[in-house]
Structure formats: structure tokens, C-alpha cells
């Protein structure tokens, strides 16, 4: 979310940014919010003026009451009483006018906030311009893509060969978008999460166990309305939502806080289940675990000073690359274009893993710099050495999300005989197992 003062002072830049994000329908909102803000500030000014007048009249009545009490002249007493009554009438009139203005002020403030929540964050100059993800730009590749000389089955078929997945039972229990993982596949899932946790701790991040639900004001603080509608499950009858990712409550931890600058940067990592409706263009897969309603994830976030966020952005996505390469999975970095950025994001990139079966890359991680957008909504401020406060910057990045990571892992480590090799970094988390041998060979 932008600062209203910035919008007031830079309307053309804000409009140009909206055009770069291909959201032209929002252009009239810039002029509307500037107009509403001017009216809001005029209301504030009038209210303050009326308060001053009311206080002056109320103060004037004090001496008049004193004179009235001491006065013996009936004519003079009547004159004093008339002045007191006139002052009281003026005070009441001012109070009535103030009530009207304050009601208008509240109405304007609500609309201003609604618009400000809709106007997108200013994107970084380095962001590629394009309307959708087909305009995302490959930046770098890491590792040589695997080109197998044998056919790679669909990932659920690989899992089924290990008796490792039961989607039919999950469908009977909860419908599409859920799964049971079993045996070595379930063990591999947990091994990846445990390894990712230790990997991030070794990077100096603090491990966090956090709430898996949050209040509506936190939801509005961490994401845009379209994201909220497409993703979040609400608990019926409660002001609670299931988290779509652990970054939500990791960032939410600092709502309405003023942080000591000396404590920054705050670098946190957490495991959590994630719950998503997955409404929209992609939806839930009829089969497979690429896009589902419930999954687990290891996440990383940073709360830092504004001048540090660009450097942390680079560090975060490189953590994901290093993690995947340590598990011998080829990946690439893809810079997200303007139209593919959520409204709160300043800059974002995807880390995509190589799929030997499809002979193409697919998204496994997403890294984002949100600038001061979340901090402004959640009121996360920093107190500097000079005593002045300013808004923090926040960033987040997927460390690993095992459902998608498992797809990449199984395809890249599948052998011609149907077995799956375990990289050395994961073997301690798999009880020393070096190779997973299928139960059913096809």
C-alpha cells in the first residue's frame, strides 16, 4: 500500500505504474482518492476550527458565570444570562456541525482506505513489463537439465510404485485437492522439510513455530483483496482464517509494533501446513499434487531497513537455488513481469525446477520484496538511533514446498529400473537410505 502523500504528490507516476501493471480500470481511482483526500483534510481542518471555537465559547462562560453569581442588578443579570445562553447555543450548534463533519470524515476515510488498498505498490524499475506470466524473463540457470533415455511416468504413478500415495481415499474423505502420502514417500516428504529447516537454521535464520490461523485484519495486512478471495479459507462464525502460507503469521507477529533498529534484520524461517482454495484460472488438478488445497512448506521471511531490502532479496532467492542444487535438482531463476506481480509486491522472481518428464521447468519457489507495503498496512515501524520512526521493509521466499519439490525430486532421481536415488544431504534424514526400491515395478 502506498503513502497517500506520495499519491498526492506523484499522481502521474502512480498512474504510469498502474498502466505498467495492465490495470487501466484502476486509473480513475487515483483522481478519486486525491479528491477524497482533499475533502477529508478539509473536514479535519473544519473540525479543528469548530473545536477551537467551542473551547473559546466554553471558556468565555466561566467569567460570565462568576459575574452572574455576584451581580445584584436584575437587568445586568438578564444580560449576562442571555450571553451565557447564546454561547451555549453556539456551542451546541458547533457540536452538531462537528458531528456531521466527523461522520463525513469517517465515510471519506473508509473510502480512501478502500482505494489505497486497491492501488498497486510501485514496482522496481528492473521488473520486466508484460501483462501475464508468459512475459516472465529467465535470468539464470543452475545445473544441467536431465534428459533421460527412458520414459518418465507421471509423478503419481512413480509414487504408486512405492505404495506411497492414495488420492482415491483422500477424495472420498475430503474431495479433490487432497492426498495421503505413505511409507517412503511420506518419509521423503518429511526428510525434505527437516533438511530445509536445518539448512535455514545454518544460514542464521531463527526457527519459528507459529499460529496456523489469523484474524481478518492480519489477512488484509499481508495480501491484496484478489489474493485473499482466491486463497483464504474462513472459519465460519469466527474472525479467523486458515493461513495460505506461514509468511502470513510470521509477518503478522509484528503488527502494531515499533522495532528497535538495532534488532534488524529479523530473519525467520518456519514450517507450516498451508490451506488454499485455489480459485481462479488454474484451479485444482483432477489428479496429481502440483496444485492442491493443503500442503506443507518451509518458508523464510526478513524484516529489515529499507536500504537493505534489495540485498536481502538477492540472498533469499539464492538460498532456494542452493537448497535445490544440494539435492541435485536443476533449477532456473525467472524474473516475474509487472502483470504477474501481486499488488503489494515491488519485485518478485520464481525458482523453477527442471521436469525431465515434460522437458521444461515448473515453479517450485517464489521470492518477493514487498517494500513497505505490508509494514504500512500492519503498522510495523522501526525506531532509529535518532529516535525517529520509519516503516520497515518485508520480504518472503519459499524455502521448499514438498508437494512440488517431490515431483521434481522423483523425476530427477528416478532410475531406469524404477528406483529413486537419495542425495547425500538427505540420507541422514532417511535413516541412511541411499536408494528407494519400488514395491511395484511397471
Region roles according to the model:
Residues 27, 141-442:
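TRNA-recognition modules of translation machinery and tRNA-sensing kinases, especially anticodon-binding
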Residues 1-145, 160, 164:
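N-terminal alpha-helical targeting/anchoring segments
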Amino acid at each position: 500500500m502506498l503513502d497517500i502523500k506520495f499519491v498526492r504528490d506523484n499522481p502521474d507516476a502512480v498512474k504510469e505504474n498502474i498502466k505498467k501493471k495492465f490495470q487501466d480500470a484502476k486509473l480513475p481511482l487515483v483522481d478519486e482518492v486525491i479528491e477524497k483526500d482533499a475533502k477529508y483534510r478539509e473536514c479535519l481542518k473544519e473540525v479543528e476550527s469548530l473545536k477551537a471555537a467551542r473551547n473559546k465559547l466554553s471558556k468565555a462562560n466561566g467569567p460570565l458565570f462568576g459575574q452572574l453569581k455576584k451581580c445584584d442588578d436584575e437587568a445586568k443579570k438578564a444580560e449576562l444570562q442571555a450571553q451565557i445562553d447564546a454561547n451555549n447555543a453556539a456551542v451546541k450548534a458547533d457540536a452538531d456541525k462537528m458531528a456531521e463533519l466527523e461522520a463525513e470524515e469517517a465515510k471519506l476515510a473508509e473510502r480512501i482506505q478502500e482505494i489505497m488498498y486497491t492501488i498497486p505498490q510501485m514496482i522496481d524499475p528492473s521488473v520486466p513489463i508484460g501483462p501475464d506470466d508468459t512475459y516472465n524473463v529467465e535470468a539464470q540457470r543452475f545445473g544441467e537439465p536431465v534428459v533421460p533415455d527412458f520414459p518418465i511416468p507421471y509423478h503419481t504413478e512413480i509414487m504408486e510404485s512405492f505404495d506411497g500415495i492414495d488420492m482415491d481415499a483422500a477424495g472420498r474423505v475430503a474431495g479433490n485437492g487432497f492426498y495421503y502420502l505413505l511409507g517412503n514417500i511420506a518419509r521423503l516428504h518429511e526428510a525434505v522439510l527437516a533438511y530445509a529447516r536445518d539448512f535455514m537454521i545454518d544460514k542464521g535464520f531463527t526457527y519459528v513455530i507459529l499460529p496456523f490461523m489469523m484474524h481478518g485484519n492480519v489477512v488484509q495486512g499481508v495480501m491484496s483483496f484478489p489474493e485473499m478471495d482466491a486463497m483464504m479459507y474462513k472459519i465460519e462464525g469466527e474472525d479467523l482464517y486458515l493461513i495460505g502460507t506461514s509468511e502470513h503469521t510470521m509477518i503478522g507477529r509484528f503488527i502494531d509494533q515499533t522495532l528497535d533498529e538495532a534488532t534488524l534484520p529479523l530473519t525467520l524461517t518456519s514450517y507450516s501446513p498451508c490451506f488454499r482454495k485455489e480459485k481462479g484460472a488454474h484451479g485444482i488438478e483432477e489428479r496429481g499434487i502440483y496444485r492442491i488445497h493443503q500442503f506443507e512448506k518451509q518458508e523464510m521471511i526478513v524484516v529489515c531497513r529499507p536500504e537493505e531490502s534489495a540485498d536481502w532479496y538477492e540472498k533469499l532467492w539464492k538460498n532456494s537455488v542452493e537448497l535445490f542444487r544440494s539435492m541435485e535438482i536443476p533449477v532456473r531463476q525467472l524474473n516475474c513481469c509487472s502483470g504477474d506481480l501481486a499488488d503489494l509486491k515491488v519485485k518478485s522472481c520464481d525458482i523453477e525446477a527442471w521436469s525431465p518428464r515434460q522437458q521444461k521447468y515448473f515453479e517450485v519457489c517464489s521470492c518477493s520484496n514487498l517494500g513497505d507495503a505490508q509494514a504500512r498496512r500492519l503498522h510495523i515501524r522501526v525506531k532509529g538511533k535518532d529516535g525517529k520512526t520509519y516503516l520497515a521493509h518485508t520480504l518472503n521466499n519459499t524455502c521448499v514446498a514438498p508437494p512440488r519439490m517431490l515431483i521434481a525430486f522423483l523425476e530427477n532421481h528416478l532410475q531406469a529400473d524404477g528406483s529413486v536415488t537419495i542425495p547425500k544431504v538427505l540420507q541422514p534424514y532417511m535413516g541412511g537410505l541411499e536408494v528407494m526400491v519400488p514395491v511395484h515395478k511397471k
